[in-house]
Amino acid sequence: IGAAQGLFLALYTAQSYAAVELLPAQDARFYVYGSALAVVLLIGGLAASFFHLGHPERAWRSATRWRTSWLSREVIVLPALMGAVLVYGLVHWLGWDLGTFGIQTQVPGDLTLIIGAGGALLAFALFLCTGMIYACIKFLQEWATWLTVVNYTLFGGASGFMLATAYSAYASPELVNFYAGWTAII
């Protein structure tokens, strides 16, 4: 799941750089296929998570304790992120921008930048929720620290940007150095 979050963040980062002309603009298909890959990985992670549940038949009730349980919060944020990434890719595929709805701006891909910003917030919220699940376990003293959240965020970001590097080598070679550089930084 972390690699999918990181991949989405990498896609959104490149689009943001392109919006301010720091990178060349990419064809919409680059974002469509990248988003599709991220959604497939998120679905795979969600499916895999059912295998470590003691009683998978009770999974539907896991969101009911969202006020006190980081796991419940994760169960809420993950589908929201999946939806945001799916909509991000779909809007790229359809070629929509705010002009489609009568709002004129000078920024290409303005609607996807707005959707992507919401998705980025959800991706970071999911890193927080996932990290806090383990950081709150007191008997695992090595994990019961705020650094667990930092590690989840950094490993997810680095693996996602590395995946974006591999993807761009195939789909958009001019972005390989950009993604590889960010992978090294993270």
Regions found by a protein language model. Name each.
Residues 1-3, 19, 65-70, 76-186:
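Long, contiguous internal "core" modules enriched in hydrophobic/ aromatic residues
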Residues 1-37:
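N-terminal signal-anchor module of multipass membrane proteins
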Residues 5-15, 45-49, 87-90:
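Alpha-helical transmembrane segments of multi-pass membrane proteins
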Residues 6, 10, 47, 53-56, ...:
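Alpha-helical transmembrane segments of polytopic integral membrane proteins
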Residues 23-84:
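Membrane helical hairpin/interfacial module
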